[in-house]
């Protein structure tokens, strides 16, 4: 991938960009094998990769510069702003949106937030695109609601320029910290969720629900999990840290009982909407802490699927699973280091199958799917 921003030394986010993709994949596979070196692995499946550029469905832009000449991108460590509208990780469909947003910021009088001076209103622009219909969700992250009326007044112009904007919100983030979003979300459109579709499974994206940023690889990850589950004698499963339900909705069959648990209510609302559309009545999604939910149960299903954040599932949940001993555990991880640590805490299990998914090209990060079987 050629990147003018990298070549000019203006952005170093893609640290592996100079390595060809096959080399990147080999290095990631070697890292994963090294992390799992203490465990016998029955089957290493071939790594899965996707496009090397234009693959991201989401842009998180720090807004800086002036209200007349805003910059959308990032701040360097010394506070110097960098415009990243030309980043080749974004699809071509993002360029016209960025181009229209800059004059809109001036029209609406949304003064960019100045970190050094702690002044200004507009902190971030968050843009998400649906692969299924090209619809977009746009979120303005503001310090307060001071400019809300001005923004509402100017909005029809932006909607006329960009009819693909299906969901538009304002998020209020009042704290002087590098936190992407606050708790308050104000909808400026009637539509509140973006429709997405992976492998004929309807998914929904709401403002405060996590969704994978590489749809081409994420859809293969979900399809692989579905294929693995279909090969197992499973009638009842848990989907812990389930997010918008991607794994559970792919794996469920009409006669399977499935419980999906996720702490974010917005994500659970998405999962319930998808389950209703699919007519899957034996699926239950609840907004709870996954560890607290699991450890309070007196019995476990045949399969527990976990998809935790980078920190892993942690010792309390590992201890519970070791004691309760479900027949199968599928572990989806965005941090193989913590996954390996967790597997060490599950001594009664052997690794049947491992597959690497290159969700984050040009970086050292990757996703991994592991099937653990009770010995």
UniProtKB/Swiss-Prot annotation:
The active site is at residue 334. InterPro entries: 23SrRNA_MeTrfase_RlmC, MeTrfase_TrmA_AS, MeTrfase_TrmA_CS, SAM-dependent_MTases_sf, U5_MeTrfase_fam. It catalyses: uridine(747) in 23S rRNA + S-adenosyl-L-methionine = 5-methyluridine(747) in 23S rRNA + S-adenosyl-L-homocysteine + H(+). Signal peptide: none annotated. The keyword Iron-sulfur applies. One of its GO terms (molecular function) is rRNA (uridine-C5-)-methyltransferase activity. It holds the Pfam family tRNA_U5-meth_tr. SUPFAM superfamilies: S-adenosyl-L-methionine-dependent methyltransferases (SSF53335). PROSITE patterns: SAM_MT_RNA_M5U (PS51687), TRMA_1 (PS01230), TRMA_2 (PS01231). Gene3D superfamilies: 2.40.50.1070, Vaccinia Virus protein VP39. Keywords: 4Fe-4S, Iron, Iron-sulfur, Metal-binding, Methyltransferase, rRNA processing, S-adenosyl-L-methionine, Transferase. Its EC number is 2.1.1.189. S-adenosyl-L-methionine binds at residues 212, 241, 262, 307. [4Fe-4S] cluster binds at residues 3, 11, 14, 87. One of its GO terms (biological process) is rRNA base methylation. It is an enzyme of class 2 (transferase). It comes from the Bacteria. Catalyzes the formation of 5-methyl-uridine at position 747 (m5U747) in 23S rRNA. PANTHER family: RNA M5U METHYLTRANSFERASE, TRNA (URACIL(54)-C(5))-METHYLTRANSFERASE. Belongs to the class I-like SAM-binding methyltransferase superfamily. RNA M5U methyltransferase family. RlmC subfamily. This is 23S rRNA (uracil(747)-C(5))-methyltransferase RlmC. The gene is rlmC.
